[in-house]
């Protein structure tokens, strides 16, 4: 009896379906939209920015941080990406100074009013289901702002 050579099966090609974008990639994409909006909204006519907390002039976009009034660690997904909670800051205030919360508060009350700030504190206690749909909707909403 002669043996037939064994044939190895070719692996099936992987399906052509695209994997859904991960939530972490959606978070990053939403954060990029937030930064674009804040930079556009608070840019001076000469193309520079003022640090919201110390008033220093920020020359380059790479040096213009988007700082949080209520830190993202305590504000959750809602305030992490809420445009009312964000302002331009320089590196020194945002990173070295931990966001300069007291000065941020004072300036926010001065420029927007106490009711505005109180509303942000109310939002701090709201929870949202930050799932894929929520991030996708926010990205679409924020893209429309700059168009």
Predicted stretch roles:
Residues 1-37, 42, 56-57, 120-147:
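A boundary/linker detector
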Residues 39-45, 78-83:
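Immediate flanking context of iron-sulfur cluster ligation sites
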Residues 56-59, 83-113:
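Short Cys/His-centered divalent metal-binding micro-motifs
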């Amino acid at each position: 009896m002669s043996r037939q050579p064994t044939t190895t099966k070719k692996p099936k090609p992987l399906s052509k379906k695209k994997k859904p974008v991960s939530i972490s990639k959606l978070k990053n994409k939403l954060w990029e939209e937030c930064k674009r909006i804040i930079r556009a909204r608070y840019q001076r006519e000469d193309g520079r920015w003022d640090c919201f907390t110390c008033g220093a002039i920020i020359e380059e976009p790479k040096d213009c941080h988007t700082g949080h009034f209520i830190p993202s660690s305590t504000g959750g997904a809602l305030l992490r990406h809420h445009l009312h909670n964000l302002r331009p800051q320089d590196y020194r205030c945002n990173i070295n100074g931990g966001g300069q919360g007291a000065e941020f508060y004072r300036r926010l009350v001065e420029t927007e009013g106490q009711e505005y700030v109180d509303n942000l504190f109310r939002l701090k206690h709201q929870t949202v289901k930050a799932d894929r749909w929520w991030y996708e909707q926010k990205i679409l909403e924020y893209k429309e702002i700059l168009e």
